[in-house]
Structure formats: C-alpha cells, structure tokens
C-alpha cells in the first residue's frame, strides 16, 4: 500500500503556521507500521488543488487530505475534488441536519455560509466528524482513495484515529510494513556518529537516519519488510553497544522525557536548584502530566544572596571559589535536597553568556551537581560557545544524564567528545 498526504492552506504553504498535523500523522502511521511515502503542500487555489488530486491519485493507493473543509471562500477541498472527478457537489442531507442541530444545541443561529460544509462530491462517502462542523468524506479517483479531514487539530486527530486508521487497515490489510527504533545520543556530533556506524553491515531492509536537534542527535533505525523487522531489535542493540556512553535513551525524544518516565509514580523524589538554567529543568519536567508525583520543588537561586539564604551555601565558599564552581554547586545541591529530604537534587550554576565570562571561566562554563542521600557528584564542564539558550539546554541535558546514570547504577560522570570537563 502506498500512502501519501496532501496538506492544504495558504498559511501552511507560506510558512505562517507550522504544520503540526502532518508530523503527528506521519508519526502515528509509523507507530502502526505504515509509512507515509510522500507529502505535498498546496495553497488555496482551485486549479492547483484539482491538479494535485488528479496527479497523485494516479500513483498512491490512499491519500489523506488535510484542510479546506470550512465554511469560507478559501475552503475549496470539496469543490476541487468534485471538479477533479468531473461530478457535481450535492448537499448531504444527513450532515445538513447535523449542522442545524449543532447550532441549535449551542443556542446560535447557523450562518448561511455553514451549509457549504454539507456539500460533498456526488460520489463521496461521508466520514463522521463527532467533534466539529466540518464533514469528512472519502472519494475514489483513479487508483486512490482520497480521505478528506478538517485542519483543526483536535478534529483531525480524532477522525484519523477513529475513522481513517481503521479504514486503511481494513481496506488494504495494512500494518507491519515498516518499523522504527530511535536512539537518543548526547555529547557527540552527527558526522562522528555516522562515521562510527558506517562500517556496520546492516541486514537487508534496515537503514539508518540521523536528526540533529541540539543538544541531541537522534539515530533512527528503519526496518522495512518482515525479515528486517525481526532483526530490528538486535541491530538496535548492536548500535547502542558500539556507541556506548553517548546513547542516553531508547525511543524517547529528550532526556527530560526519560527522567520523567523513570521517576513518575516510582516513589523517588527530586528537588532542583537552578542558577544559570533559570528554571529550565523544572519547567521541562512540569511539562509532563504526573510530575507532581516526584518533583518536590524547583528553586531558581540566581543571586548569591538567594544561594546563601535559601540553600544554605556558605558565604565563604562563594568568596573563595565564586558562584560558578564545584564547591558552590555541591552546596546548592545538598541544600536543595535537605529542605524536603528528597532522594535526589540537581543543581546548576554557570555562565550562559553572551557576557560575564573570564579567561579562567569563559562563557559556557557550567558547574553541575547531583546530591543523593549517600553523597554528591559534581563536574564543571566547558560547553561550546553558542547561544545563551543553547548553553542552558545542554546544561540541563547533562544534569539529567547524571541523574539517569545514577538511577541505572552506572558511572555518574562520563566523558563526552564534544563537551570538555575541567579537572577537579
């Protein structure tokens, strides 16, 4: 089965909005063993829509069309589909009735323009939209079924999960055509990773892909075909073994996701004291539902005074070693852990830039500590001088990795090829 997607809308084509629907759809299909083989974006021009429907229907088996089902003049998907097939638009009585009922239930008078949403190509099969006014439908043209969905994300996602995916699986016996495993890496460049893995003899049907989204490089291991899918687990394990410490998570998008998964409902507690990361670690963890089950507190102790008064850092330590030092960050972590007797505490203090660096401690110098009930681990790293935002993101990632390694019973402090570490 050959699956394609056509995204519509001038705002998408012009880059005025990010097409999150397409990314979500492709990922969902991959999770179900189905690969999207082509994606096309078209503006709100009738002739362009007609042309792309006709052209792609000659090559694909099923096409998911997203957008253009609203009531306004620039919503042209139904009209374009009818024209592409050489048939008329007709009012779907069932959907027209549902539109009137919807507005009545909400105590509103239905604008005349909304009846447009009930006009479908003559041969169309209505596809239910249980949460909106845009009527979905599917039409057979040439070799392809074209499946039309609204652009509103929550309507689109529900229709795909409840209508499109079951239709595809039933009609095309789809599934288990492709599988994907992901390895998240930290502290090594994309080209270096590729050079390391180039010598591997991969089984037929297995290919590698790389995605850089700092501070991580994601290695994607694709398997196409039954035999390749069977070998996928062993190949992924071999890659992870080759790369060693740089692999920090399997099938996760970030280290904060990995830490959340490990700590959520685990009975383990965490406190965080942040200076240069400015609440980033806490914010990232709070972004996950359920983080209250393990996150005791997040303290942004930016000034020296707050480090002393809130965390109990010794003024003498600050005078002798400075805010960006192993000694200070260790006291920060110990103080944060002690407040609520947390199992663990992370602390960061550094120079994110663009100013504030010295010859001894240039921009990108960051001290990070992990306090446990049995002691404290710490390191001071020199990050590549990039943006202030990037220094904060890499610092957070290294802090998460220290905690991850402690949870795994591994060495907490390890070398990263792209991150220098100061000697203690």
Curated annotation (Swiss-Prot):
Protein name: CinA-like protein
Pfam family, one: CinA
SUPFAM superfamilies membership: CinA-like, Molybdenum cofactor biosynthesis proteins
Domain of life, source organism: Bacteria
UniProt cross-references to Gene3D superfamilies, sorted A to Z: CinA-like (3.90.950.20), MoaB/Mog-like domain (3.40.980.10)
InterPro entries with a match to the protein in the record: CinA, CinA-like_C, CinA_C, Competence-induced_CinA, MoaB/Mog-like_dom_sf, MoaB/Mog_dom
Sequence similarity: Belongs to the CinA family.
Organism encoding this protein: Shewanella amazonensis (strain ATCC BAA-1098 / SB2B)
Lineage, opening ranks: Bacteria, Pseudomonadati, Pseudomonadota, Gammaproteobacteria, Alteromonadales
């Amino acid at each position: 089965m050959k699956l394609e997607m056509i995204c519509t809308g001038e705002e998408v084509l012009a880059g005025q909005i990010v097409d999150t629907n397409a990314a979500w759809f492709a990922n969902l299909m991959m999770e179900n063993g189905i690969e999207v083989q082509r994606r096309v974006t078209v503006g709100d021009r009738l002739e362009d829509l007609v042309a792309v429907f006709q052209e792609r229907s000659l090559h694909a088996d099923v096409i998911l069309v997203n957008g253009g089902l609203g009531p306004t003049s620039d919503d042209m998907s139904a009209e374009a589909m009818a024209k592409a097939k050489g048939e008329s638009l007709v009012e779907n009585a069932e959907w027209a009735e549902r539109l009137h009922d919807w507005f009545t239930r909400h105590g509103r008078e239905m604008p005349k323009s909304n009846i447009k949403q009930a006009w479908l190509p003559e041969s169309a099969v209505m596809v239910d939209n249980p949460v909106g006014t845009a009527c979905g439908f599917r039409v057979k043209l040439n070799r392809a079924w074209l499946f039309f969905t609204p652009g509103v994300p929550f309507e689109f996602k529900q229709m795909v999960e409840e209508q499109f995916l079951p239709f595809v699986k039933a009609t095309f016996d789809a599934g288990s055509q492709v599988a994907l495993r992901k390895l998240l890496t930290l502290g090594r460049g994309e080209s270096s990773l590729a050079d390391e893995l180039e010598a591997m003899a991969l089984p037929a049907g297995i290919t590698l892909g790389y995605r850089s989204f700092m501070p991580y490089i994601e290695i994607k291991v694709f398997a196409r075909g039954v035999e390749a899918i069977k070998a996928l687990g062993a190949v992924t394990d071999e890659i992870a073994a080759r790369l060693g410490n740089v692999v920090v998570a399997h099938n996760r998008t970030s280290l904060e996701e990995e830490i959340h998964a490990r700590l959520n409902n685990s009975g383990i507690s965490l406190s965080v004291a942040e200076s240069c990361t400015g609440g980033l670690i806490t914010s990232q963890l709070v972004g996950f539902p359920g983080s209250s089950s393990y996150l005791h507190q997040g303290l942004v102790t930016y000034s020296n005074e707050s480090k002393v008064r809130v965390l109990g850092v010794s003024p003498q330590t600050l005078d002798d070693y400075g805010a960006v030092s192993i000694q200070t960050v260790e006291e920060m972590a110990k103080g944060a852990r002690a407040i609520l007797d947390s199992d663990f505490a992370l602390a960061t203090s550094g120079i994110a830039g663009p100013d504030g660096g010295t010859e001894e401690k240039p921009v990108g110098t960051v001290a990070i500590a992990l306090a446990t009930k049995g002691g404290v681990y710490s390191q001071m790293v020199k990050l590549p001088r990039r943006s202030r935002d990037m220094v904060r993101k890499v610092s957070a990632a290294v802090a998460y990795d220290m905690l991850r390694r402690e949870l795994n019973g591994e060495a907490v402090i390890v070398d990263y090829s792209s991150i220098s570490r100061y000697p203690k």
